[in-house]
Amino acid sequence: MYSKSRKIQSVVVMLAFMILAASAWGGAPARAESGVSEPYRIVALGDSLTAGYEHGYTEKSVPYGYVEQVYEQSLFHGLRAEYVNYGILGLKAEGLNRLLEAVSGGRTVKADDIQKELQDPRKETLAAQTAQMAKSIRSASLIVLTIGGNDLLPVMTKLDSGATAEEITTYIQTILDQYEKDLEASIRTIAALNPKAQMVMSDQYLPVPAPLQFGSTTIELYPEAKRKLLLDGVTKLRGKLELVSTRLADDGIKLQVADVSSLFVGHELEYTSIAQGDIHPNHLGYAAMGRAFATAIWGDYRTIRPRQANVQMSVVVAGKELPASAAPPVLRSNRSFVAMRDITDALGAKLTWNNATQSATVSYNNHTVILAIGSAYVTIDGKKVKLTTPPAFLLKSGKESKTYLPLAALSEALGLQVTYRGTLQTAFINK
């Protein structure tokens, strides 16, 4: 896959990179207290695929790429997760290696010290973050990575120059030999900084579709001879990844390879913006990448159940969605409320109801929380605190009335992580 816009004949044309918003740790930070799990920290490194770039993005765009989907999958698995994304548009393997050398050596660098003519408008800001990158990598539980598409970028120019197939093949081999060296050096640097982190990177997909067949008529969207040469390059890049992974394994360093390329075969027009002249994935393509990474990391890809039209959101507690029999969650003033018994059962918390005071006492994880219907205050471990949400309330559900509690206020008071993902319309509660 070529992680930079470039000229392709017919429908495939040049498109310049646009600005992505800077990334920082995502998700709520874990609270340092007894009984609370250590955070599951995800660090993302690499090129524009890691940055989550899509066709038409501007500096105000919020990425929703494979990294964000890996983060969501970690929440689905009951992990108290957070993430940081250091993806740089236009980055090549050599640039990644230089960046990581600076990170490891504790040096502050400028963008040109990493790679000349980087296309990312955030390049100086990102290059200056070597100290933060080192801290992030050292504390990471999982490191995800994409790199290689930009290394093959010069092949397009070579193809347009009229070079022979033999010359192109030799040229690709030269590029990939250097790619192999830079990639291995990068992974070894990461492993030296954090030998315990799980490392997963993807292979590269080819965005150029095969010829379309309509009866006896064949339509080439791109010259087939050239497409096959590009496909050969992508295939050989996968081979280099496997060679590096094998050598690293011999030294006790595990690098997993997520199979992205096969998922795009036959879906190039569906999963990318190639018809608009941009080779980057669209939301469907990034979802496919997310599935590939999640499968490599956890062995599955999780989703929520389809919601009925009257259900505003879903709730996942410690990796399990509230059962279909649970009362539907309710949104009030953009805050989530759940039926009292449903959430306490899901947590395994002790619940006591005081009918006289119309209050619920929830005990869990060495915390005791008291919420009263209509009260603007909550009592947390004996201390009265003003709610920042609407108060608990009664709501008729079928033939009975149910007590609804403010989800975030209750969960945070119990020392839990609460994360709402608008992309999924789902609240995740993790220990």
Language-model segments: what does each one mean?
Residues 207-308:
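Catalytic His-Asp segment of secreted/periplasmic serine-dependent ester chemistry enzymes
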Residues 25-32, 291, 295-431:
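Primary recognition of N-terminal secretory signal peptides and signal-anchoring hydrophobic helices
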